[in-house]
């Protein structure tokens, strides 16, 4: 049984990292339902913060389906951007500018290069969709940053 079984997934891809459609393709056959997918330019947004519209989507889908049923997947090219996105969906918007300012959802959040995601999807599809980007990203830094955020702020660390 995958951590994605029966979960509602919000994908926040990165134009310079892992795009949304690549992660969505990997999720086929996992039992997860992608309820929203976007591909952003993290370096284009204010200091790498999560786009206000995406914050609104995360908030409304979490209200609709329940935080315990949600997983957020990010594809940011850099650990710092991935960490900001993860912090936003767990502890609230650190810039205090968006709908998640002061809202501690504590959601499950993973990066596409983390073993929790990679080991839950078809390896051939992963290699085809994400393998090339995995080679150029600083995977160890991304994993360390994501793990740190989950340990500090995650409510659903199963």
From Swiss-Prot:
Bilayer-crossing regions: none
Q: Quickly give the catalysed reaction.
A: acetyl phosphate + [thioredoxin]-disulfide + NH4(+) + H2O = [thioredoxin]-dithiol + glycine + phosphate + H(+); acetyl phosphate + methylamine + [thioredoxin]-disulfide + H2O = sarcosine + [thioredoxin]-dithiol + phosphate + H(+); acetyl phosphate + trimethylamine + [thioredoxin]-disulfide + H2O = glycine betaine + [thioredoxin]-dithiol + phosphate + H(+)
Taxonomic superkingdom: Bacteria
Q: Which Gene Ontology molecular function entries are recorded, alphabetically? A: betaine reductase activity; glycine reductase activity; sarcosine reductase activity
Q: Does the keyword Oxidoreductase apply?
A: yes
For the protein in the UniProt heading, the enzyme class is: oxidoreductase
Which Pfam family, any one, appears in the UniProt record?
GRDA
Which InterPro entries does the record associate with it? GRDA
Provide this UniProt record's keywords sorted from A to Z: Oxidoreductase, Selenocysteine
* Gene Ontology cellular-component terms listed: glycine reductase complex
Query: Which residues does the Swiss-Prot or TrEMBL record annotate as the active site?
Result: 44
Q: Which NCBIfam families match?
A: reduct_selen_A (NF040748)
Q: How does it assemble?
A: Monomer. Component of the glycine, sarcosine and betaine reductase complexes, together with components B and C.
Family membership: Belongs to the GrdA family.
Job of this protein: In the first step of glycine, betaine and sarcosine reductases, the substrate is bound to component PB via a Schiff base intermediate. Then the PB-activated substrate is nucleophilically attacked by the selenol anion of component PA to transform it to a carboxymethylated selenoether and the respective amine. By action of component PC, acetyl phosphate is formed, leaving component PA in its oxidized state. Finally component PA becomes reduced by the thioredoxin system to start a new catalytic cycle of reductive deamination.
Entry protein name: Glycine/sarcosine/betaine reductase complex component A2
- Gene name on record? grdA2
